[in-house]
Structures are given as C-alpha cells and as structure tokens.
Design a protein with these regions (language model features):
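ABC family nucleotide-binding domain
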Residues: 1-177
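C-terminal boundary and immediately downstream tail of ABC-type ATPase nucleotide-binding domains
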Residues: 174, 178-197
C-alpha cells in the first residue's frame, strides 16, 4: 500500500476503527453518530456519479434518499445489538458498554473489510466488558477480520487466529493462540503470561 500508484484512501474506506474512549460526538444523537460517515461518503459518490453520468438506476438520487437509507441501515445495526431504543438519545446518557457497542456499530455502518480495535474494553467498568467482548466474538464468528490490541487474554485465547505479543513497540512473539498460551518461547512473553493468567 506504500506504492504511489495505490490510492490509500480506497483502502481506508474499507477499514473501521474502534478506540478505547469511544470517540462518539457528544453533540449528535446515537443514530446521527452512526449515519454521519455513510451519508458523507455516499453524497460525495452521488455527486461524482452525477457529474460523470454513471449513476446506477437503483442508487439513491438525492441527499434525502441517502439519509433515509443510512438511517434504516443504522437502525438495523442498533436492533442487532439491542440498542434500537437508544437511537435518538445523546451519548452522555449511555453506559460505557453501550457507548462502545455504538462505536462498533458506527464502524460497521461503513461495511468495512477489517476493523481495528485499540483496547476496546480498557475504559469500561468490569461489568460492561462482557457485552462488548460478546459483540466482538459475534463479529469474529461471522468472519469479520479484526486486529485487536487487548489485555483480555481469555478473549484472545478464544477468538484469535494469531496472537502477537509486543513490548516497547517490538513484536517479541507471534503464534497461534494454542501455541502462544501453552508454549510461549520468549522469556518476556512467559513473564507476562505468568502475571496475567
């Protein structure tokens, strides 16, 4: 992707990111947070298609149609995680677990091929961790490719295809979870696992 001929923005469009502090916009409702990126991108695509005369017959023709379609898709995603009733509330009224699930749904709204998670449970109360991990397990079981930075070793053991252990910005060990947890090779990995397992 570092080749100058590659349009990095096309790759970025197929990646979602979920951060440890949710990064929801507090001045927007839950549904507005979820709809914002799809509406923006689709409106740009609509303009471009109209200019080039390449608009598909079944594509939305106006911003209002794009918004209506994005709203229905966002509501479906909220239904999936049991938060449809929170569509029109502001993030400040949600629990940490609810905020993080909304952040995941916001990433899913762009229909990514890959989702990057940066410590998605670290800012949560212990009681809320399970609901976020359950959603992530569901995504993994559906075939979503995820790169997850986490200290949740049980989750990594259960869900990961590969585990990479990093220390001070360097990869010290990489292995399938069965091998990583049962037979770590690196001394620093062994030390870490002895403290957290």
């Amino acid at each position: 992707i570092t080749d100058k001929k590659v349009d990095i923005n096309l790759h970025r469009r197929k990646m979602g990111m979920v951060f440890q502090h949710f990064n929801l916009f507090n001045n927007m409702t839950v549904i507005e947070n979820i709809m914002m990126a799809p509406v923006y991108v689709r409106c740009k695509e609509l303009k471009k298609a109209k200019r080039k005369g390449t608009l598909a017959p079944d594509a939305p023709k106006t911003k209002a149609e794009i918004k209506a379609q994005a709203r229905e898709e966002a509501l479906e995603l909220l239904r999936r995680i049991g938060l449809e009733d929170k569509a029109d509330v502001y993030p400040s009224t949600l629990s940490g677990g609810q905020k993080q699930r909304v952040a995941i749904v916001r990433a899913l709204a762009m229909k990514p091929d890959v989702i990057l998670f940066d410590e998605p449970t670290s800012a949560l109360d212990p009681e809320m961790v399970g609901e976020v991990l359950d959603l992530m397990k569901e995504l993994a079981n559906e075939g979503m490719t995820m790169v997850v930075v986490t200290h949740e070793m049980g989750f990594a053991r259960e869900v990961a295809n590969r585990v990479l252990f990093m220390d001070q910005g360097k990869i010290l060990e990489e292995a399938p979870p069965e091998e990583f947890f049962a037979h770590p090779k690196n001394e620093r990995t062994k030390e870490f696992l002895s403290k957290v397992l």
